[in-house]
């Protein structure tokens, strides 16, 4: 049989397994690929292939992540699985592997554990929109009352962290039985994928979001005006549309009078394009790197926010010492550094290298931001942390 060419006819969704160490995340990932491979929806990938996750660098941070892909009747999935707890924390905070949804794996024999809680909290903080639960290792539990108790605990925990605990599908099964080819194991995997297909919402495509482009460079072209360059982050910009210049200074309105890519003139630029945009009546000194061009009214500048942050360990090239309240590093948003002051919660004296923490920040200049925006923390040009805006405070 000739090899089928990969055609993107199905909608694409990014997903990942989360949960406590040894509850069976990697076994489940392997089981999904092996079961879906039977219908040609995946390449069967063994446990040890996934477990030997390659290291990747994202914003100066080394993260081990395994990627597999598979498809159901309805969708194409890219699935990420991490070997260690620290990799999950880093992955979710840096957004190295964007998650449109998650499969929370909980061992029925152990119930929710500390990392179960931490992963649910992180998923909430970084804006993972939905999750489905796989109650694993049910073959090790003889008592149906105990299973029911664990399910109740999981639902309560999800509700506590702001997920709809009563609605979330919980599938009971055994990844090991699925890997061994037992019918009840296989049935549970198929049930799980049906739940993922129907419960995890289709992500909004970047082109359907409001236009936004971080400014990387500004040029003056004699006789034509000011051109700003950058990579369109979301949406579409058409010639003749009104746009706003947001961040660092007062918001200004202008009009796009030209879009250029690879020295060719276009009618529009869309997310992912590296473009130059000609601005009507805007002077060279009125725009700078670090601002953004955006659809009017779609984004506002802010200087106070709360964040979930991973602080690099000394081994990762981070700080050698903890930092305390009023620490003033640089916050790198999109294309620029802005100095800010960190305010720790009253019950936290210091943050150690290698920790993840929640704290508030006040920047010296406002930046165009929305919840979910990622940033790096830098000190003297080196990255010492990575974070995500969880709440805007002004």
UniProtKB/Swiss-Prot annotation:
Catalysed reactions, semicolon-separated: GTP + H2O = GDP + phosphate + H(+)
Keyword terms: Cytoplasm, Elongation factor, GTP-binding, Hydrolase, Magnesium, Metal-binding, Nucleotide-binding, Protein biosynthesis
Chain residue ranges for the region called G4: 136-139
Region (G2): 60-64
EC number: 3.6.5.3
Domain tr-type G: 10-204
Residues reported to bind GTP: 19-26, 81-85, 136-139
Function: GTP hydrolase that promotes the GTP-dependent binding of aminoacyl-tRNA to the A-site of ribosomes during protein biosynthesis.
Name of the protein in question: Elongation factor Tu
Organism this protein belongs to: Rickettsia typhi (strain ATCC VR-144 / Wilmington)
Gene coding for it: tuf
